[in-house]
């Protein structure tokens, strides 16, 4: 992560969390502007260039006349930085970015009446506090999913059941040390993954929410992360690089998105994923509209299109995520009948979804500290 991302995170969160003021959303839509600029996670918006079966852009462009341009971002901090610079209409923001974008007035509330497919949303996500603030709705849910433990099946003939294989120095089932063979996510929000591990292994600390940590709890989590540093082969944020590391660099265990595991399995690589006993973090992503979007009509058209069942199912099949429209589970031959079950549709209540840590008057450690400390830890300090 660059220092620019870190600075933008700190600035965005230096504001007190209050109800954000923004322009009132439109009541009707004019003619589409002919263009749409979106910031998205890798693999989230495909037009058939990687695999021609996976294309949910071409038909949208034909039907609306909105030419879609995608800028991929590898971390939430990068998304916040890009939205701060401006020039984009939409962003597929995870919960650790959405509040920062709302409080930083980088996104505007939407009028859900202009999104006919809104009524098809999964009730579990409709009221998510990562995009509903002060009685206003800041965006359209897109996909959700878990951060799983991905492992090499040759190294682990029996699936590992705990995150300790990436946090604690040990010999793995093949008799070799895990030193230099495991990875961690290159983003401050990974502190929450370590907090889940500490919550399970040090119950006396009383961690209830891995994103809202007292100073004592936070220091215990940092201790685990500092100890982990000597085990780390690479702090990953680029999905392609992580997949290459599993194929070519001897990496055998790491947190990962289902996307990487699906891609590696499709190549015949010996990898699998597991939901460890300590639990997992996860992401519920929202398509959010920039406060100064130049193409708002195309943006509204896209938000509605993104909620069509087949698009939802196709994205879930490609990324290894879950649709926010339950009908998406049945609408995509690419996802298949069991796709939602395989990807974890019933895990929703067991996932600690990414959100922005907030101080709440000094009771908890704020995200600005998470950012500073995680950069130091990745640098070996």
UniProtKB/Swiss-Prot annotation:
It is found in: Periplasm. Keywords: Acyltransferase, Periplasm, PHB biosynthesis, Signal, Transferase, Transport. CDD domains: PBP2_polyamine_1. Its EC number is 2.3.1.-. It catalyses: (3R)-3-hydroxybutanoyl-CoA + [(3R)-hydroxybutanoate](n) = [(3R)-hydroxybutanoate](n+1) + CoA. This is Bifunctional polyhydroxybutyrate synthase / ABC transporter periplasmic binding protein. The keyword Transferase applies. Induction: Induced under nitrogen-limited growth. InterPro entries: SBP, Sperm_putr-bd. One of its GO terms (cellular component) is outer membrane-bounded periplasmic space. Disruption phenotype: The deletion mutant contains 30% less cPHB in the outer membrane than the wild-type strain. Natural transformation rate of the mutant is reduced by 2.7-6.7 folds. Mutant is also defective in chemical transformation. Optimum pH is 6.8-7.8. The gene is ydcS. Residues 1-22 form the signal peptide. SUPFAM superfamilies: Periplasmic binding protein-like II (SSF53850). GO terms for biological process: DNA import into cell involved in transformation; poly-hydroxybutyrate biosynthetic process; polyamine transport; transmembrane transport. Optimum temperature is 37 degrees Celsius. GO terms for molecular function: acyltransferase activity; polyamine binding. Catalyzes the formation of short polymers of R-3-hydroxybutyrate (cPHB). Involved in natural transformation. Probably part of the ABC transporter complex YdcSTUV. During natural transformation, may bind dsDNA and convey it to the inner membrane channel formed by YdcV. Its main location: periplasm. It holds the Pfam family SBP_bac_8. Belongs to the bacterial solute-binding protein PotD/PotF family. It comes from Escherichia coli (strain K12).
